[in-house]
Amino acid sequence: VLSVKISVSPVTPLVDQKLHQEDSKQFPYLCPMDFKRRRLAVTLRNQLNYPLQFNPFVFSKLFLLWVAVGIVGGVIASFYWTVLESLLHYLSQFQGFAVIPLMTVAGLLAGLIIHFLGDPGEMDLIVNNIRFKGGRLEPKNNPAMILSSWICIASGGSAGPEAPLVQVVGSTGTWIARKLRIKGEDLRSLSIAGMASAFTALFGAPLGGSLFALEIQHHKHISEYYQALMPALVASCSGYVVFILLTHIGIGPTWVFPIYSTPELNDFFYAMLYALAGTAAGWLFILTVRQSRSLFKKLRVPIYVKMTIGGLLIGTIAYFVPLSRYFSHDELNVLLEQQFTLKFLLILLGAKILAIAFTVTSGWRGGFIIPLFFVGATVGLVVNAAFPGQNLPLIMVSCMAAINACVTRTPISTTVLLATLTGFHHFIPILFASLTGFFLAPKTPLINAQLGIKE
């Protein structure tokens, strides 16, 4: 029996020729067909030893990892949202004067949770960790973040679930990366992918959520972590599908805006003009938050005392202006469906800005993106009431885009998010308004970590 030993090293044409000559001398009876089979076997062995050459597709193991992070994020977001909806339904029974003691006690309970389980931080800390700690978000703070944010949001705080979910899902991406011994930029990309998955689950916009997770990292540059864009997009898409399947929340605009007429060339200029009002509201919001933060920092008391005081203040505002309660996910539709006087809208605007400021500076957990959209919509209604006969959908969406871009420094993702959330599919006027708010924003951003200064 003839035995032929197959080498696993790569075979070049020169080596092929030498092997053929040696085989011809040693085995004169070896036919050309046997040599071809031998060369084919060596070629197949080499392809198996180099899987990247064997795989004809673009996707790799990292692609599957991005999908897995998105699926895990979708499951976490679904669980969080389901529990939050149940708590909102139960605590919404407290109306009138009962809101004040409810939110005061809620602040105390959430503060005690943070005091004993540890401070999970806020969006500022998340951005700081992504930028200066290699993208590592600590999962050990998740229990405190989940429990305290459930209480704060469900009782009526003017902050949404986006910030808690970003921390929880983003840190889950970090945990997965550590378990798989992934380091460097790949670890940071997985954390950002988790953040994008959380944003997308709440906003229902995979592209907008991915861009927001990147833009929020810097006050000027969207592309600082451009290598994380593809992981963020993949995780967002897989997470969004899982979230929709588990919650049955539906696909479509979150807020039903009036039908927008056929766009005209002047609409771009009007969008920038209306955006000035939204930008002014953004300045007012930033100044109010900074003043409130300064006041609470002067209180040398434990976190649960600050949060109790914050709950008392927010509850008092909610008692006098009930529409300012909660994070405005459903309340914005009330603005669109009912008619209000100019006086009431001005009162609501001031009350909501104060409520958000007291919420985020007293230690209450939650994000201010959706509440900011509510403030922008209110500003749009104020402009329309003061100058009737204008294009109401364009006014509202322009003010919403401008104030969010002014405060969060995210003009591109804000444009995509609003087009998805409102069903306002005329993209360019929103972009003009977002850029107006971005370039007229204060030089120092509200989120200090966006400046690139390590804290």
Placement of each model-derived feature along the sequence:
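Alpha-helical transmembrane segments and immediately membrane-proximal extracytoplasmic
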Residues: 14, 19, 23-455
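Short, low-complexity, charge-dense intrinsically disordered segments
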Residues: 1-15, 24-25
